[in-house]
Design a protein with these regions (language model features):
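Bacterial N-terminal signal peptides that target proteins for export
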Residues: 1-8
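Bacterial N-terminal signal peptides
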Residues: 8-17
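C-terminal regions of mature proteins
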Residues: 23-30, 234, 389-539, 656-727, ...
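Mature N-terminal segment immediately following signal peptide/propeptide cleavage
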Residues: 32-69
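Buried hydrophobic packing residues in well-ordered domains
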Residues: 52, 70, 88, 129, ...
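M16/MPP (pitrilysin/insulinase) zinc-metallopeptidase core fold and M16-derived inactive scaffolds
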Residues: 67-132, 197-202, 212, 317-335, ...
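M16/insulysin-pitrilysin zinc metalloprotease superfamily fold
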Residues: 96-100, 132-165, 346-403, 555, ...
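Non-catalytic accessory/assembly modules
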Residues: 109, 140-142, 152-197, 201-216, ...
């Protein structure tokens, strides 16, 4: 469980030394300077167009991806009462043609051809459109993007199609617990509030009616709400801010001036006099939760004082004496988070969300009593300046060493944030902590009382008496019982609860290490027989952070479902054992992960390097002697079984992909086998298994970042001395990939409890050779956009439609997937095959220039800049796992792609894609779609394990 992190900010008097103001444009419409981190070398220009559109321009001469986002201050909360989902449908329609670019899909094809991505989302109070693209094509993308907001066509033919896609999205997510929870929760809200409506829409709410065509409603909504003064635009590119400004003025000043009618955010979220409320919700998956949601005034204007962040840090604490630690000791909770929930201009919520065990749900009243006892304790003795000062120091460090984010992520976040914060604080707002304000914090704490509570209980065993209209959620809603209200409003205390102490992991030494290096890539250091360290001193990101990985590979990790389950439980027990100790480290920017994998388990420590050795030593001690108590084991065992059962309730396309990988890899086990093994596991079996797992191992480590060679060796020595000891060295090879037979497709039919059908078609590659991988990647690149355009936009087969290259242990392949509410698997497969044959003509007619563009775009993706140290570390770690010790896998793959000629690619497409006598697999499910009885007889895989065992293998990459 991870607390919702709320970073503090710097003191105003530190701005001169800790932040750098960016230049701004002044033309009678000036804005203040933008506060940026010292590590940020971009240029910024904030500007307002003549039509009122607010713009932020960002110049980054080094970026390989340009990006833009436009946010409109209108969303589903402004849907007409009789047209739920209208704003969402409008969002879809803007992608389907404008006066200047009338062809549906032309914008997306242009973006994808030039190595980009595009998307949009609709929220109750705003709608966000965004894209990224290879830097040199920004101008062309903006020309197309701007027309969304100037001259959208709303072609009647595409309205009918896209209404079907919106309905497919609705259908696909009918069993999504996230959407179902929100749908039920909204039954308690004031129907006038933007958050209360049915946001997605479906074929009924968006249907044409006599005298009321949905196209007319779309145009009316667009003309009323898509106004420049209600929009914010962020553009990031290599060009100067002045040139970017000139482009934006030229392209976006055609957006109609004026301001839209704002959503009714002045309406309280809950009708007056209805709180406190108790709501019970039955989920699809086996999930148990208690959400204590408190109605509060909006905290947006108090962002510089961070009252909610302060409160969240104490209520969400996971250290000794915390509410979470106490609940976990009782066996009642698996996780806890605290922080702001809904946030609007006038009203919001503060929420404490607790993931419960079965017994925890039964004892929700005692849990509530302890929560309110803690709130009283904080009010009486916990509002102190030292906590505030510590949070400010943490924020000062994080802001000083703020890492870059992808352009795609940055622009969409800033465009949305511009509605709520002064432009000068777009970066700084999450970090800003101006002054400790005890009275303000206490005023918000006073709102966290039972009288302001909407308690939501989620669990499969709850009793309910109502059914929500759109998603069919079973729920109940009533006034919080008077005895519960009286109990929680009393003055009870809990002596086992106490407030956190000062954080011992706060980084002190933040100096960048100096090291003489002959090469700028990891170098090998043999620590002992069977244990290798790879070391790379890297301060090129200007950050005192580092990533230390160690993988323990064992021949006993996953050869059976039992071993796989026990390895998983071992990692879970140790992580749980260390949670209270490591939580302060996490807050201080020093985290760890412990996870099992196909050959054993990996420990990763990441963050500021100053106190990593302290954390590592404690983790190693726990790995050596895990505390397998009955309470801990039972709780984690139940949690694992619950997770495995819930896999059968994932989206059909997710289940199809997961089953495909199980059919192809001999170290991945089916959930039913793992459930059986997990239910049979005992604490005694786990205790006996750990020495067996560790007795003979192969170990490899990576220290990458702000380390000297001596510091890296010291960390490795801790691993050798504290964990490995005199354990025997072993060689643990990779798992192997099943070699499919060249024949008619083998078909695996799943029984998935979901109304949608799904079909995944997988074409297996011939070898691990780079030349083969390059061709499969090119095929995925070339077909991605047209496959989507054909099967989703034109044929309306479903909401989840995608295709692309799919590696399995570096063996290339292609996968095509459609999840459909109205098409049976046979029809989906036929459409896929027809697409491939039709697209062969496009490849035959493809020009050298077009092919070169696809090839260049793919190379750009392969060679994309690694914006963060962690991205480079992840690549190094993957290359180490693959025994790719040149650390130049990207360069070699890019070279192989560049060597593929158009003639080579045409031959490959004919022999490896169109020839379905080649090895391929089909995974499907019929759902509630008709056609299962009429399906053509196929070469069915009845016993998947026997199928996998009967086939040959590709040699793994390390053999």
């Amino acid at each position: 469980m991870k607390l919702l992190r709320y970073l503090a900010g710097l003191l105003v008097f530190l701005l001169a030394t800790a932040v750098t103001p960016a230049q701004h444009y002044e033309a009678g419409q000036a804005v203040a300077d933008i506060i940026t981190s010292p590590s940020d070398d971009r240029d910024y220009l904030a500007h307002r167009l003549k039509n009122g559109l607010r713009v932020l321009l960002i110049s980054d001469p080094h970026t390989d991806k340009a990006a833009a986002a436009l946010d409109v201050r209108v969303g589903s909360g402004s849907d007409p009462e009789e047209r739920p989902g209208l704003a969402h449908l409008l969002e879809h329609m803007l992608f389907l043609g404008t006066e200047r670019y009338p062809e549906a899909g032309e914008y997306q094809a242009f973006i994808q051809l030039h190595g980009g991505n595009d998307n949009a989302y609709t929220m109750p109070d705003h709608t966000n459109y965004y894209f990224d693209i290879e830097s040199q094509y920004l101008r062309g993308a903006l020309e197309r993007f701007s027309q969304f907001f100037v001259a959208a066509l709303f072609n009647p033919r595409f309205i009918e199609r896209e209404r079907g896609i919106v309905h497919a999205e609705f259908s696909a997510k009918l069993q999504s617990d996230g959407r179902r929870y929100l749908a039920a929760r909204r039954q308690a809200f004031d129907p006038r509030h933007p958050e209360s409506g049915f946001a997605v829409g479906n074929e009924n709410t968006l249907a044409d009616r006599e005298g009321d065509l949905v196209r007319e409603d779309l145009i009316g909504f667009y003309e009323a709400h898509y106004r420049a003064e209600s929009m914010t635009l962020v553009v990031l590119g290599r060009e100067s801010t002045v040139l970017l400004r000139d482009w934006v003025e030229e392209l976006f000043e055609g957006v109609p001036a004026g301001k839209a009618i704002a959503p009714q955010t002045e309406v309280p979220i809950y009708p007056l006099g209805t709180l406190p409320l108790l709501q019970k919700i039955i989920p699809v998956k086996e999930i148990r939760q208690a959400v204590f949601s408190f109605a509060i005034p909006s905290a947006l204007d108090d962002y510089a004082a961070k009252p909610l962040s302060y409160i969240a840090s104490l209520l969400g604490d996971e250290g000794p004496g915390s509410l979470f630690a106490l609940l976990k000791e009782q066996g009642w909770a698996e996780g806890l988070s605290a922080g702001g929930g809904l946030s609007y201009e006038h009203y919001g919520t503060f929420e404490v969300t607790i993931s419960l065990t079965e017994s925890g749900l039964e004892n929700y009243q005692r849990i509530g009593a302890w929560l309110f006892a803690l709130i009283r304790q904080i009010s009486e003795e916990g509002v102190t300046s030292w906590v505030f000062d510590e949070q400010r120091k943490l924020a000062e460090i994080d802001f000083r060493f703020r890492e870059d984010v992808e352009a795609y992520t940055l622009v969409r976040a800033f465009a949305a944030r511009m509605h709520d914060y002064p432009v000068q604080d777009l970066y700084y707002a999450p970090y800003r902590y101006d002054k400790f304000n005890r009275e303000l914090i206490l005023s918000y704490l006073d709102r966290l009382q039972p009288r302001n509570l909407h308690l939501l209980l989620v669990g499969p065993e709850l009793e309910t008496d109502q059914v929500e209209t759109h998603y069919g959620v079973h729920y109940s809603l009533e006034t919080l019982p008077s005895d519960v209200l009286e109990d929680w409003s009393g003055l009870s205390t809990n002596p086992d609860l106490y407030l956190p102490k000062p954080n011992p992991f706060l980084a002190v030494d933040l100096e960048l290490r100096q090291e003489q290096l002959e090469v700028s890539k990891p170098t090998r250091i043999d620590i002992q027989d069977g244990f290798t360290l790879w070391f790379d001193h890297d301060t090129s990101y200007g950050s005192p952070r580092g990533n230390f990985y160690v993988s323990i590979r064992s021949p006993h990790a996953r050869t059976t479902p039992r071993e796989a389950v026990l390895t998983n439980l071992y990692a879970a027990v140790v992580a749980d054992q260390l949670n209270a100790f490591s939580y302060p480290a996490q807050l201080a920017g020093l985290g760890f992960e412990l996870y099992d994998h196909q050959r054993g388990f990996t420990l990763k420590i990441s963050g500021y390097t100053d106190k990593q050795a302290v954390l590592l030593e404690t983790i190693l001690a726990a790995l050596r002697v895990p505390e397998v108590t009955s309470e801990r084991f039972d709780r984690l065992q139940d949690n694992l079984v619950q997770q495995l059962r819930n896999l059968a309730l994932e989206q059909p396309y997710e289940q199809a992909i997961a089953d495909l990988r199980r059919l192809l890899l001999d170290t991945i086990w089916w959930p039913n086998a793992k459930i059986e093994a997990a239910e049979a596991a005992t604490p005694e079996a786990l205790v006996a298994f750990v020495p067996q797992l560790l007795e003979s191992v192969e170990s490899v480590a990576l220290a990458h970042g702000n380390y000297t060679r001596e510091e890296a060796l010291s960390l490795a020595a801790l691993v050798a001395g504290e964990l490995l000891g005199t354990n025997r060295a072993a060689v643990v090879p990779h798992g192997q990939v099943v070699r499919l037979a060249a024949s008619e497709a083998r078909v695996r039919t799943l029984s998935i409890d979901h109304p949608d059908a799904v079909l995944a078609l997988y074409l297996q590659g011939e070898s691990h050779e780079l030349s083969d991988r390059a061709k499969y990647y090119l095929a995925g690149q070339v077909m991605n956009a047209p496959f989507y355009q054909s099967l989703r936009t034109e044929q309306q087969m479903g909401y989840f439609v995608f295709s692309g290259a799919m590696d399995v242990m570096q063996l290339p392949g292609l996968v095509f997937i459609v999840q459909s509410p109205n098409q049976a698997p046979d029809a989906i497969e036929a459409a896929m095959i027809e697409f491939l044959h039709d697209y062969a003509a496009s490849i035959d007619s493809m020009t050298s220039a077009e092919f070169e563009q696809h090839r260049s775009s793919l190379v750009g993706d392969v060679m994309r800049q690694e914006e963060k140290l962690s991205y480079r570390s992840s690549r190094y770690w993957l290359e180490i796992d693959r025994n790719d010790y040149g650390f130049d896998s990207r360069e070699r793959l890019a070279a192989a792609i560049n060597e593929v000629s158009l003639d080579d690619f045409r031959k490959f497409f004919q022999t490896s894609v169109l020839d379905l006598a080649r090895p391929h697999l089909v995974v499907r499910s019929f759902g509630a779609v008709t056609g299962a009885e009429a399906a053509l007889p196929r070469n069915e895989i009845v016993d998947p394990l026997a199928f996998r065992s009967s086939l040959g293998r590709f040699f793994s990459v390390d053999e």
